[in-house]
Amino acid sequence: MKKVLYLGGFEMPDKNAAAQRVMANALLLHEMGFEVSFIGSTKDRANAVAEANGFKCEYVDYPKDVGQWLKYITEFVSTEKILAHKPDYVILYNFPAVASLKILKVSHKNGIKVIHDITEWEIANGWSPRAIIRKIDICMRMRYCMKKMDGVIAISRFLYNQYKDFTNCILIPPTIDLTNTKWDRNRELTVGRTIQLIYAGSVGSGHKDKLNVIIDAVKTFPSIQLNVIGLDQKHYEIIFGEMPKGCTNVIFKGRLPHVEAVKAVCDSDFQMLIRDNSLKNRAGFPTKFVESMSCCTPLIATLSSNIGDYLQDGINGFVVDENQRLFDVFSRIIGMNGKDIIEMKQNCKNFTGFDYRNFKTEFEKIFQ
């Protein structure tokens, strides 16, 4: 049995979107006959799991100071430890440039193929010494290192187009296991008297999610309630300023465990995904889009990344653009009857394109 070693800043088993991404890929590789193991990062080694879904998990400590951070981005883990696993393939998840090149050099000397799973184009703000180092690293990674890899797993069409002419590149959006009961896909699809919207996320660096825009629009629709998961009102006001006066239909629920957040999405009528058309958003692909579809919950979204390949206005959600503002979408929703909304939920349920099993043929282009 051939071995795959997955390296990167993921926190197993489901503490971040990175962990969910690599786990779905690992499940597919396992079904293809590969033995997969992980070396991720952790901020809490005492509670880090040694095994997730049957896959062995090891960790490096998340850096706490400048010295540790420099080692993290230039080495991550020793090449001796990598070779001790005797892998046939090493997959690097959003890996720093210098560490990538070191691993690539040693791996090629030992007949190991190196694949890069790339899910974002990071942005480093400011001009502090650390920010300058990050800018250099990001530039090297995206414009040089990626093209040297034996293969690239690109999360978005934007990244796929960047590297398809330079290496063996496959397009794999965020994927999930549709048989997992957390999606609760066999429940009765219903809608209540008050339309339930949900924002589930952390806003992100650079405020990639425009939660303030959503709140400004929803405040004038008392028959719509917005539930915010991932931050509390205090955190929101630190980022965006005070809540609008008289806004009574927004409820902040703070951070929740992943499974509880997924249940909240299942219990909602629409999920909100409003983002700018920035380089970062074009290069990535929102995991919450995939999760919402899997939960049978339609989306109200701007067309960041290539989600336009999947989102159909009025069918499985609503598109917000220059022709249809968020206010216009909310006006459409309050004019809908429950049957129409349930039909949209059913359309989401009928779509199974994000199940990881659909991408076996693509994976076989790299992993043989």
Question: What residue spans do the PLM features occupy?
Answer:
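Membrane-proximal helix-turn-helix segments that form the acceptor-binding/catalytic region
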Residues: 24-27, 73, 77-80, 98-100, ...
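Donor nucleotide-sugar binding/catalytic pocket of nucleotide-sugar-dependent glycosyltransferases
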Residues: 40, 58, 142-184, 190-192, ...
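A charged, aromatic-enriched C-terminal amphipathic alpha-helix characteristic of glycosyltransferases
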Residues: 17, 324, 339-367
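A short alpha->beta transition loop at the rim of the catalytic pocket in nucleotide-sugar-dependent
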Residues: 269, 296-297
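Conserved acidic donor-binding segment of nucleotide-sugar-dependent glycosyltransferases
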Residues: 313-324, 332-338
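Conserved catalytic-core segment of nucleotide-activated headgroup transferases in glycan assembly
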Residues: 21-24, 178, 183, 193-241, ...
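N-terminal strand-loop element at the rim of the active site
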Residues: 12-13, 28-70, 81, 159-162, ...
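Nucleotide-sugar-dependent
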Residues: 17, 205-209, 259-264, 271-291, ...
